[in-house]
Amino acid sequence: MSSVFEIVNQARRKNKLKRELLDNEKKVRDNRKRVDLLENLLDYIKPEMSHDEIVAIIKNMKADYEDRVDDHIIKSAEISKARRDISRRIRELTEEDKQTSGKK
């Protein structure tokens, strides 16, 4: 019986480490995106530009990123809907299988 507990304990530990790894990878990816954003900003800003021109560039970049966020939110909603539809279909198939198996 103790080996079962050890297996469960190790599986939980493995899952926890997997979640931590995914979280850390997300943080690395997010920070790389920030670095890319700042590099892009440096490419656009020139020494002879006025403050208003710089602000206009930043506002334009902000609007572009907000549009991307909106696109990702919409895509997430579509994926979630597809997952719910699949789950519903699996439940229906399971119920049909139970009813068919019960009649045999």
Curated annotation (Swiss-Prot):
Pfam families from the entry?
A: DUF496
Q: Which residues form a coiled coil?
A: 7-34, 76-96
Protein name (Swiss-Prot/TrEMBL): Pole-localizer protein TmaR
Q: Does the keyword Aminoacyl-tRNA synthetase apply?
A: no
InterPro entries assigned: DUF496 (IPR007458)
Q: Do the record's keywords include Chaperone?
A: no
Key words of the record: Coiled coil, Cytoplasm
Parts of the chain that traverse the membrane:
none
Q: What does this protein do?
A: Pole-localizer protein involved in the regulation of several cellular processes.
Signal sequence bounds = none
GO CC, sorted alphabetically, is: cytosol
Question: Belongs to which family?
Answer: Belongs to the pole-localizer TmaR family.
Q: Where in the cell is it found?
A: Cytoplasm
What organism is recorded for this protein?
Vibrio parahaemolyticus serotype O3:K6 (strain RIMD 2210633)
Primary subcellular site in the record, as a coarse category: cytoplasm
Q: What domain of life is recorded for the organism? A: Bacteria
